[in-house]
């Protein structure tokens, strides 16, 4: 008896699609991944997809630093993948496998970089980026135009020519990025027509590190709760995390005199940068664990901190935050002063905030730096 053996022919499909793995769904890592997908297509004409598990095609991983490094073997992270990681946890009691040192890890703040250095892992700092289009759109919407030529300020937004400089002035090659310069003649003070005194967007889990309860207590002490809008998971807040459209969020940010950011610790912290991108100043704890994108801003309001205590996360055991030690009456007074100053900001002040962000934290600036670490191409 003769057998006719048929050998299957493999169907090999080659694709230029760039695969990004996000650490979770409907979270900050997912949001960063979706923005990367949008702007790598806009500025480089590269199509990418966002996945939520590791695959052989993964080129970029956007996730929590401790989670990825501690599970580097179980996750089967491809050797060619670029890890763009950060974390709000200052310490973990789990061991990081030694082969994690085989990866170059990009992170978003100096204190996160210090963690990696102590672990013996090569690292570089590449900050997160905001939504360029919405930042320009809603900043331009709040600008007041005036024909008084003696007081007109002529500014170019997002072209990198601003004199305002920040801590992370990433200077990667952006020659292949299409410029989108918006010129606006502006004058006057736009603070009088703001809808809210204070806005806060506090995303994330219910582990308390965003200090939602503290902010509510401060607003009550200053009788500001009725003139504030809060996004958080608590029932006392006005909207749930990730429930707003991008237009609703940026409209909200642009209609506030002050953005409150009282988080204990952040790998980076996108919401306060989004607020500054539309000219809204930020009040925050004076802490190395939160002030990476804030400390060099032309206008910001630090609240006094008298040290830190290590606080274990109630939701993820073995992970710890750096909780600031403060005097409540003191920070209430400083918060009140911050709002008073924010109320008197001029358009020129708000332009400075907007340009600081566009120069340092726009995708037009950040993507060339990522490209460099991804082998020079996406």
Swiss-Prot record:
Q: What is its EC number?
A: 2.4.-.-
Pfam families cross-referenced by the UniProt entry = Glycos_transf_1
Q: Which InterPro entries match?
A: Glyco_trans_1
For this entry, the protein name equals Putative glycosyltransferase ORF378
The residue range of the signal peptide is: none
- Recorded family membership: Belongs to the glycosyltransferase group 1 family. Glycosyltransferase 4 subfamily.
Q: Which domain of life is it from?
A: Viruses
One GO term in the molecular function aspect is: glycosyltransferase activity
Q: Which UniProt keywords apply?
A: Glycosyltransferase, Transferase
């Amino acid at each position: 008896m003769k057998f006719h053996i048929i050998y299957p022919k493999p169907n090999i499909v080659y694709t230029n699609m760039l695969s990004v793995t996000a650490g979770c769904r409907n979270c900050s890592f997912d949001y960063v991944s979706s923005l990367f997908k949008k702007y790598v297509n806009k500025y480089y004409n590269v199509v990418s997809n966002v996945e939520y598990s590791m695959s052989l095609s993964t080129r970029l991983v956007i996730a929590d630093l401790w989670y990825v490094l501690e599970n580097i073997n179980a996750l089967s992270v491809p050797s060619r993948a670029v890890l763009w990681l950060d974390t709000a946890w200052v310490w973990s009691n789990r061991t990081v496998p030694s082969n994690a040192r085989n990866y170059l890890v990009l992170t978003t703040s100096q204190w996160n970089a210090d963690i990696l250095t102590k672990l013996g892992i090569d690292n570089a700092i590449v900050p997160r980026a905001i939504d360029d289009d919405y930042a320009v759109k809603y900043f331009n919407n709040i600008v007041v135009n005036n024909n008084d030529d003696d007081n007109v300020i002529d500014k170019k937004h997002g072209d990198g020519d601003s004199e305002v400089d920040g801590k992370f002035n990433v200077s990667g090659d952006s020659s292949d990025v299409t410029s989108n310069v918006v010129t606006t003649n502006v004058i006057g003070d736009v603070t009088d027509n703001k809808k809210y005194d204070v806005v806060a967007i506090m995303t994330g889990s219910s582990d308390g590190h965003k200090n939602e309860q503290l902010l509510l207590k401060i607003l009550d002490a200053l009788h500001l709760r009725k003139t504030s809008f809060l996004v958080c998971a608590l029932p006392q807040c006005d909207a749930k995390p990730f429930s707003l459209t991008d237009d609703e969020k940026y409209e909200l940010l642009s209609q506030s005199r002050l953005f409150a950011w009282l988080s204990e610790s952040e790998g980076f912290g996108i919401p306060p940068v989004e607020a500054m991108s539309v000219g809204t100043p930020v009040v925050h704890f004076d802490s190395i664990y939160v002030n990476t994108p804030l400390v060099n801003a032309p206008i910001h309001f630090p609240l006094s901190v008298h040290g830190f205590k290590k606080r274990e996360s109630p939701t993820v055991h073995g992970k710890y935050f750096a909780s600031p030690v403060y005097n409540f009456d003191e920070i209430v007074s400083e918060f009140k002063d911050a709002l008073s100053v924010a109320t008197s900001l001029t358009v020129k002040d708000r332009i400075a905030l907007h340009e600081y962000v566009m120069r340092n934290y726009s995708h037009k600036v950040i993507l060339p730096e990522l490209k460099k670490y991804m082998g020079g191409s996406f």
